Amino acid sequence: MSTSTSLMPLRIVVDSREQNPFPFAGLPVVVSVGTLEAGDYSLAGFERKVAVERKELGDLIGCLSVERERFERELARLRGYDCAAVVVEAPVAD
């Protein structure tokens, strides 16, 4: 019997409405596409507990101004999750 344990790859679910999904290229993950109730990404088996909303900097600016009501609804949906995050994707200089 082997004493080494091999880790299963992380299984990420990408929401089917995500227009430009993160590629996860070269990372030890398995990606599947599905419809999530909240967020753009989750973990397989934890779709109702874990949600990640991904925003590019330009999207975030829109969400804080002209699309604020929609963003507030997104945040309200995330409140019901055990683990939720909004990730802003931008260069460090920005």
Regions of interest found by a model, annotated:
Residues M1-T3, Q19, V30-D94:
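Extended, alpha-helix-rich binding/interface surfaces that flank or overlap catalytic cores
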Residues S4-V29:
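Short, charged N-terminal beta->alpha structural module
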